[in-house]
């Protein structure tokens, strides 16, 4: 299986399966000399980990990260950084009834046809469990970017199923299980309680933002920053759509509205989402993700087995009724990995380029 490594200079290779002994990643290309400990990584893993509320899977994994290499006396050495997260709460017996059949909407069918076999335990390699190493690697990228450029990452949920979530303040996001930017989440609690009792699942919309991104990241024509962001975000489990800036709303805009006016004191708007011509402008990078409903649900559905015969599928086990609830820290990590890689690439080719006129300030839109 190829397709497990992302990045050109900051390369991350992800390994493991949902019910294997461990999952992890190897980071190659991290600059030397940065202070790094497990604690620097664990904070983001704790934001993503399962079992933190009744609205997510009750699989109780501590997701404790171990740094196996690439750090000496508390600093990165420039050699590959190996990160390991041990699986401790697998329950493979829950998947015995679907070992010979395919879950509608799941990767089961495609994996089986492509590779000739599949690991049904928790989805194997296709499981969202494999996003934990991504978050770990993203934490390393976040730390370097924060120290080098002051870049910061944050994400929130802007829609849960049919329910839009109005934006009030980023300050609310850490204080509720939905990563919602609102003070009162009772309506979303009630919605998820009813959904879980019905045996169904729902999708979500996630907003991801990077602030303090330097001007100049991205390599046209085919390695544009926004192209790489979209590419990597589509690799996140259950993502079915990616928008940069105004995204699909651009269709209904006029050029007089969509084009972000430039003034000596800053951009007047940010419909471009921080990227023009595939290159960062210094504006906030704005990304929106559409996440489909979870495919592993207890409601009976029609499918076929590995012999092509009709069957009924009921998925047991512990699953997220909405995978979007835990997607915010994962999306932050993926955005950080793309920006980190492009920052190193920009430094390698254009690090000596100096403009007499400083970049204009970014507009703050919330």
Swiss-Prot record:
Keywords: Amino-acid biosynthesis, Aromatic amino acid biosynthesis, FAD, Flavoprotein, FMN, Lyase, NADP
Cofactor: FMNH2
The keyword Transmembrane is assigned to this record: no
GO CC annotations on file: cytosol
Reaction(s) catalysed by this chain's protein: 5-O-(1-carboxyvinyl)-3-phosphoshikimate = chorismate + phosphate
EC number from the UniProt entry: 4.2.3.5
Presence of keyword Amino-acid biosynthesis: yes
InterPro entries named among the record's database cross-references: Chorismate_synth, Chorismate_synth_AroC_sf, Chorismate_synthase_CS
Subunit structure: Homotetramer.
Protein name in UniProt: Chorismate synthase
Record organism: Acidovorax sp. (strain JS42)
